[in-house]
Amino acid sequence: MKHTLFYFVLATFASLWTACSPLASEPQSATSVNQLPDIFPDYVDVTIPSEIAPLRFKLRHAPEDAIVSISCGEEKIVCEASGEKGFLIDEGQWNDLLEASVGKELEVKVYEKKEGNWQMYLPFHWSVSSDSVDPYLVYRLIEPGYETWNQMGIYQRRLEDFEETAVISNHLTGHNCINCHSFPNQDPNQMVLHMRGKRGGTYLFQSGNITKLNGKVSDKIPSLVYPSWHPSGDFIAFSTNQTRQAFHFNDENRIEVMDYSSDVLLYDVKNNEVMTVPQLFSDKAFETFPHFSSDGKTLYFCSAEAQKMPEDYQKVKYSLCSIAFNPDTRTFGNQVDTLYNGKETGKSVSFPRVSPDGKFLAFTLSGYGNFSIWHKE
C-alpha cells in the first residue's frame, strides 16, 4: 500500500553516511526472490518531493554484500552498500535523477549476495511529486537516554540536503530543559518555545522580538507547556502540566514521567490574555495535548480521570476528546465528544495530530499515562 512521504527523512543517520562508489554495477546474473527487501527506514512505495535529499537506507540484517539500482527510463543510479551504513546514494547523482523524474516513478531494485550468489528482491517504486517540500524540519535534538539530559537544543535540518544547524542550544541557557516548540502554519517568523528549570517559562518569538508569556500566571496556572497554534495565528491552546519523573527499580520501562495535574487553556496572542473554561479545566480530570483542527473549528485534546499520584499512575488512561471552538467569539462549545475511550479500552492516548487536509487524525496509543516515549509497549 502506498503511503506519502513528504517530510520524513531520518536525520540521525545523516552524519554517519558518505556517498557510495560510482564504480558499482548491477550483478550480471541474479536469482529472483518473490519478496520485498526488509529495509530500514521502510521506504517501499512512497511518494517523495523532487527536492528531497537522497533516501539513504539499509537492509535490516547485515548482508554479505548488497547493491541497489534506482532508475527511471534511461537514467539510473547504482550503489553498493557501505557495510552497516547501508546505501549511501550520491547527492549529485540523486539530484540529477530526480530532476529528470518529476511526475514519474523511480524503480528500485535491491540485490543481496548470499553465500557468494546474488539474488534480487521484488522491485518497489518511488513516485516523484511535482509538489515542493518545506525546506526545513525543526526538532529537539537530545541523546536517546537520560545520562546526558542537560545537553540538548532545538535544531533545524535542511531537507534538500543533510545540513543541520542549531536554532537554540541549551548551553546558552544554563543547560536547562528546552522543549515544546511550535510554529503557526510552518511560519518561521513566529514560534513558541518552553523551557524548564533556570529561566523557565514559555517564550513567544515574533519577527525578531522575544516575549516571555509566563513566569507564573497564577497558582492554578503555573506554566504554559504543550502548545497548538490556531490556524489564524491569533490563539494558542496550551496545556498546563505539573510533571514529575521517577525511576523504576525493576520494570521494563526504566523511566516513568507522569503528570500530577494538567489542564488545557487558551492564550490570545493579540491581547496577551489567558482564558479557561470548565470543559477543559477541571480538578476531576487531567487534560493535556491540545491540538487544533486544520479549519480551526475544533480543538482535540486528551483527558483522563484524575488519580492519586504517583501511587495510581498506571490507572491513568487518557481518552481522545474534542470540543467545538468559535474564533470570532473566542468561545468553546458546551459539549465534549469522546472519540476514543481510553478507560473502556484499557489504553491511553497521547499526541493527537490532524492532517493538513483535515481528513486524517493520528495519535499514539500506550498502556497508560501520556509520556509514551519511554514505554516499550
Where are these regions (language model features)?
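Conserved beta-strand position repeated across blades of beta-propeller domains
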Residues: 182-184, 228, 291, 353
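Residue-level detector of Asp-centered blade-edge/turn motifs that repeat once per structural unit
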Residues: 185-187, 231-232, 294-295, 356-357
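Multi-bladed beta-propeller domains
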Residues: 32-42, 76-93, 160-176, 205-223, ...
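Low-complexity, Pro/Ser/Thr- and charge-rich linker/hinge segments at domain boundaries
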Residues: 39, 118-146, 219-220
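Hydrophobic beta-strand positions that form the internal "hydrophobic ladder"
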Residues: 137, 190-191, 233-236, 296-299, ...
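Conserved, compact domain cores that house catalytic/ligand-binding motifs in diverse enzymes
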Residues: 136-214, 219-220
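Short, conserved, GDST-rich strand-edge loop motifs in beta-rich repeat architectures
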Residues: 135-148, 238-260, 301-318, 364-377
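C-terminal motif of bacterial Sec signal peptides marking the signal peptidase cleavage site
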Residues: 18-19
